Regions:
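Residue-level recognition of conserved structural "scaffold" positions that shape functional pockets
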Residues: 70, 96-97, 118, 134, ...
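Alpha-helical scaffold segments in soluble metabolic enzymes
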Residues: 21, 25, 76, 113, ...
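Alpha/beta enzyme core
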Residues: 1-86, 92-110
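A short, charged, Gly/Pro-tolerant segment at domain boundaries
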Residues: 142-148
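C-terminal helical cap(s) of enzyme catalytic domains, especially alpha/beta-barrels
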Residues: 45-59, 101, 114-138
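Small/polar glycine-rich anion-binding or flexible loop at a beta-alpha turn
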Residues: 91-95, 117, 148
Length: 148
């Protein structure tokens, strides 16, 4: 960080035993923002060819299946460091995004869902706004980290 003039966003891998170790190290190193989670490492086998389906044997798993893991890791990191977090991993609805905010993400990012629903981000924003109105939140920041 001491050589960077721009904000430093550290994207953390979920392929660790304890995400808080990485979060603390990134915070101590001067990260301005944490981004988590990246993809989980997975493997697919082509049962007809009886070999690996991916050229590198393993690859990144993303999408709805990783969401509960991402929520847990955002929660753990948010409770370990005082660094803003961009929560990502399997977000495909307003409910998914709200979960991330409630456990401590200051912002969210949508990835895989954009491939099959080009309006997903707009739908999520609309859903968050409706949730805020229904639950009397004046701003998104009022929601951040209230689930302890």
């Amino acid at each position: 960080k001491k050589h960077a003039k721009q904000p430093v966003i550290m994207k953390l891998s979920p392929n660790v035993t304890d995400i808080t170790v990485m979060a603390r190290a990134a915070g101590a190193g001067g990260a301005d923002v944490l981004s988590l989670i990246n993809t989980l490492t997975g493997m697919k086998i082509d049962i007809n060819r009886k070999t690996f389906a991916l050229a590198n044997k393993t690859g990144g798993v993303s999408g709805p299946a990783v969401h509960p893991i991402a929520v847990r890791m955002v929660y753990e990191a948010a409770n370990a460091v005082n660094v803003p977090i961009i929560g990502m991993g399997g977000i495909e609805s307003a409910e998914d995004a709200i979960e991330m905010l409630l456990v401590g993400a200051s912002a969210v990012s949508v990835g895989t869902a954009n491939f099959y629903n080009p309006t997903v981000t707009m739908d999520i924003v609309d859903g968050i706004e409706a949730y805020m109105k229904q639950n009397h939140f004046a701003s998104v920041q009022d929601m951040v980290g209230i689930v302890k």
